[in-house]
């Protein structure tokens, strides 16, 4: 007998099944995104208003 791959519901035809997608090798923690954003805002504020501080 041949092995059959489970295809899911017939109503989901054409939709992406995210569990079958490959995962990215680049992992970024949410803390790093927040840290880079805060650093960017601080650097931008210093460059913009630095002469007034």
Swiss-Prot record:
Domain of life: Archaea
Stretches of the chain found on the membrane's Extracellular side: 50-53
Keyword field contains Transport: yes
Keywords: Cell membrane, Membrane, Protein transport, Translocation, Transmembrane, Transmembrane helix, Transport
GO biological process per UniProt: protein transport
Cytoplasmic domain ranges by topology: 1-30
Subcellular locations according to the entry: Cell membrane
Keyword field contains Hydrolase: no
Topology relative to the membrane: Single-pass membrane protein
Segments crossing the lipid bilayer: 31-49
GO CC, any one term: plasma membrane
Role played: Subunit of the protein translocation channel SecYEG. The function of the beta subunit is unknown, but it may be involved in stabilization of the trimeric complex.
Subunit structure: Component of the Sec protein translocase complex. Heterotrimer consisting of alpha (SecY), beta (SecG) and gamma (SecE) subunits. The heterotrimers can form oligomers, although 1 heterotrimer is thought to be able to translocate proteins. Interacts with the ribosome. May interact with SecDF, and other proteins may be involved.
Similarity field: Belongs to the SEC61-beta family.
HAMAP family, A to Z: SecG
Protein name: Preprotein translocase subunit SecG
Organism whose genome encodes this protein: Methanocaldococcus jannaschii (strain ATCC 43067 / DSM 2661 / JAL-1 / JCM 10045 / NBRC 100440)
